[in-house]
Amino acid sequence: MWDSLIVSINDTHKLGLEDCLAVFGHVPITKAVKHVRLTEIDTQTSTFTLKFLHTETGQNIEKIIYFIDNDTGNDTRTATGIKQIFNKMFRIAAEKRKLSLIQIDTVEYPCTLVDLLILVGVALPPLCYLYRPALHAIFFLVPNPVGSTLEAWLDSDLVLRLIIVAEFLTHALETLIFVVPRLKYYRVPGEFVPEWLLLGLLEGYGPARRLDTKARTLGEGSVN
């Protein structure tokens, strides 16, 4: 009776099913838990069955999970009512695991004017350190007493090295505080993490902002 709904949920809500297995099925989600899928919906007992492969034992395991209390009046005799209950369970399970309902499986590179200006600003100290005429060329465009004083102060290997180190440490701290938690929250696959971290070291907060923007474009991922 629910075959088409089961197929739809398995196709589009793998993360939600995994969350339900962890939160409502009380199964720890480790690397050994693979291929979580919905196999049955039983409205008579108000349960659904999840099946998954446990690679350490090599066994396919079934877990029967009760639907949460239907306190919103959803009719479990209809596909619409079942979808609404699943949506609620997906949201609750994701919140309990402190994860997003959606997954970001791409790398968003800097493309806005602000992003590009930040990259230019990051590149200037190393450029001036390696090629000192670049420093003088920059301040040639600002011929005033303040510019001359600042140029004289920056015209030092020690000062430029300190700026480069401070820049790196600041961005590393921003990456640790803002980017890393979002990579976990948005379930970014491991193969994309190194690029996101590298962008964090280059830009600081920028990648965190792009992760949030990408998440907003993906929406919540309800059962349709």
From Swiss-Prot:
Which cysteine pairs make disulfide bonds?
Answer: none
- Top-level taxon in the UniProt lineage: Eukaryota
Where is it mainly found? Answer: endoplasmic reticulum
Keywords from the UniProt entry: Endoplasmic reticulum, Glycoprotein
Q: Which positions does UniProt annotate with glycan attachment?
A: N10, N70, N74
Q: Per the record, what is one GO cellular component?
A: endoplasmic reticulum
Query: What subcellular compartments does it reside in?
Result: Endoplasmic reticulum
Q: What else is known?
A: Present with 2120 molecules/cell in log phase SD medium.
Protein name in the entry = Uncharacterized protein YDR476C
| Organism annotation | Saccharomyces cerevisiae (strain ATCC 204508 / S288c)
